[in-house]
Amino acid sequence: MLSSLSPHLSNVRQTLTQVLNFALVLSTAFMMWKALSIYTNSSSPIVVVLSGSMEPAFQRGDLLFLWNRSPRAEVGEIVVYNVRGKDIPIVHRVVRAFGDDARDPKEGGGKKGKSASGTGKKESVAAGAVHSDSSFVSHKLLTKGDNNIADDTELYARGQDYLDRKVDLVGSVRGYIPAVGYVTIMLSEHPWLKSVLLGLMGVMVILQRE
């Protein structure tokens, strides 16, 4: 009887080993992500460009590496910010920067001027979330996509004329790898690909057991 159960027990042990190995891979990846998040001071230190509003600087599918430990963002710097009230992080360039106090630029920090005029806009959206740190001073920013006609005022939350460095920014772009994040775009635009990948993973597990 024990001899007849032995193959089944062996299969169970093999399955448990594969599950534990998979869990170990996931937990290791999660710990590496959290460590990178702490090091960069950004809750989303790596993001993928999902639209063409920053062309030619960045293309869809480019993988961006962020840094969020600088107290200021300078004019010309490319940043990722979060739209308040929406889970829509956007990759755009700083075109105006206002002082280090919390006053409205219209009242005490200078009048805000738009860098361009027009109506048509595209958003360079990236996967990620906003992260703030109380050590940052208040710093107001106006952003714009390089491939857009107008600045981002219409993209901001209602009643918001500029970004707050402390509240809205996910981080500043410090490096990138072209195109490697395009698989993220494919999975978001074609949900059926997720099912195909899961099916392939299941087949691989079965083949490994054999």
Swiss-Prot record:
Cellular component GO terms, alphabetical: signal peptidase complex
Task: Give the UniProt subcellular location, in the record's own words.
Answer: Endoplasmic reticulum membrane
| Enzyme type, top EC level | hydrolase
Q: Which InterPro entries match?
A: LexA/Signal_pep-like_sf, Pept_S26A_signal_pept_1_Ser-AS, Peptidase_S26, Peptidase_S26B
Q: What catalytic reaction does the record list?
A: Cleavage of hydrophobic, N-terminal signal or leader sequences from secreted and periplasmic proteins
- Region of interest: C-terminal short (CTS) helix: 196-207
Signal peptide limits: none
Q: Which residues lie on this side of the membrane: Cytoplasmic?
A: 1-14
Q: Name one GO molecular function term.
A: serine-type endopeptidase activity
* Ranges of biased composition (kind: Basic and acidic residues): 101-110
User: Which sequence ranges are listed under topological domain Lumenal?
Assistant: 32-210
Glycan attachment residues as annotated in the record: N41
| Annotated active site | S53, H92, D152
GO BP terms in the entry? protein targeting to ER; signal peptide processing
Membrane-spanning segments: 15-31
Its EC number(s): 3.4.21.89
Q: Where is this region: Disordered?
A: 101-124
Q: How does it sit in the membrane?
A: Single-pass type II membrane protein
Q: Which UniProt keywords apply?
A: Endoplasmic reticulum, Glycoprotein, Hydrolase, Membrane, Protease, Signal-anchor, Transmembrane, Transmembrane helix
Family statement = Belongs to the peptidase S26B family.
PANTHER family associated with the record: SIGNAL PEPTIDASE COMPLEX CATALYTIC SUBUNIT SEC11
Question: What domain notes does the record hold?
Answer: The C-terminal short (CTS) helix is essential for catalytic activity. It may be accommodated as a transmembrane helix in the thinned membrane environment of the complex, similarly to the signal peptide in the complex substrates.
Q: Whom does it interact with, and what assembly results?
A: Component of the signal peptidase complex (SPC) composed of a catalytic subunit SEC11 and three accessory subunits SPC1, SPC2 and SPC3. The complex induces a local thinning of the ER membrane which is used to measure the length of the signal peptide (SP) h-region of protein substrates. This ensures the selectivity of the complex towards h-regions shorter than 18-20 amino acids. SPC associates with the translocon complex.
What exactly does this protein do? Catalytic component of the signal peptidase complex (SPC) which catalyzes the cleavage of N-terminal signal sequences from nascent proteins as they are translocated into the lumen of the endoplasmic reticulum. Specifically cleaves N-terminal signal peptides that contain a hydrophobic alpha-helix (h-region) shorter than 18-20 amino acids.
> What is the name of the protein in this document?
Signal peptidase complex catalytic subunit SEC11
From which source organism is this entry? Uncinocarpus reesii (strain UAMH 1704)
